[in-house]
From Swiss-Prot:
It comes from Sodalis glossinidius (strain morsitans). GO terms for molecular function: protein-L-isoaspartate (D-aspartate) O-methyltransferase activity. GO terms for cellular component: cytoplasm. The lineage of its organism: Bacteria, Pseudomonadati, Pseudomonadota, Gammaproteobacteria, Enterobacterales. This is Protein-L-isoaspartate O-methyltransferase. Its main location: cytoplasm. Keywords: Cytoplasm, Methyltransferase, S-adenosyl-L-methionine, Transferase.
Length: 208
């Protein structure tokens, strides 16, 4: 059965320039309403960010798609996500690559996301409660790193965990934030500014 809301959202994403069909298929397969509170279920397929509690949000579908597309993933990519949040972005990634590592600083959110992902029968994901600024050193290096909260500057620890030829996509800034792509080439880092965005801040440390 075709879900009209999903198809409408996918059409909007195509109009906004999203071209990766594998990505669009993944977004079609992942039920966004599974990752939000019942009070916001009627807005699950609106192209907007929604609150998930504890001062955090589930990102606007366009931003999820844009950031994922910029990673230029292939099935064998080793991916690190900083900021598991609701688990929605994690689920999209899990449909595209063999394995995803995801770090969340808020224990309650990490537990909730882990439960949701298990209910969707997604088992190619490792989650960890920890400080996103530090990444996940023992699992690196990574071909792709996606950061779903905004640090004021690019964390050096994450740059160090990016493999040769790898790509990191993240929002950077305080009051004025810009979606940024970092590519590691021959031991150097090429940094590109993509577009203006608005994210919650990437807070240091972890919260029980």
């Amino acid at each position: 059965m075709v879900d009209v809301r999903t198809q409408t959202l996918l059409a909007q994403l195509r109009q906004q320039g999203i071209r990766d069909e594998r990505l669009l298929q993944a977004m079609e397969a992942v039920p966004r309403e599974h990752f939000i509170d019942e009070a916001f279920e009627h807005k699950a397929y609106d192209n907007t960010a929604l609150p998930i509690g504890l001062g955090q949000t589930i990102s606007q579908p366009y931003i999820v798609a844009r950031m994922t597309e910029l990673l230029a993933l292939w099935p064998e990519s080793r991916v690190l996500e900083i900021g598991t949040g609701s688990g929605y972005q994690t689920a999209i990634l899990a449909h595209l690559v063999k394995h995803v590592c995801s770090v969340e600083r808020i224990k309650k959110l990490q537990w909730q996301a882990k439960r949701r992902l298990k209910l969707l029968d997604l088992h190619n994901i490792s989650t960890r409660h920890g400080d996103g600024w530090q990444g996940w050193l023992s699992r690196g290096p990574f071909d792709a790193i996606i950061v779903t909260a905004a640090p004021p500057e690019i964390p050096q620890a994450l740059m160090a965990q990016l493999d040769e030829g790898g790509v990191m996509v993240l929002p950077v800034g305080d009051e004025q934030q810009h979606l940024t792509r970092v590519r590691r080439k021959g031991g150097e880092f090429v940094v590109d500014t993509v577009e203006a965005v608005r994210f919650v801040p990437l807070v240091k440390g972890e919260l029980a």
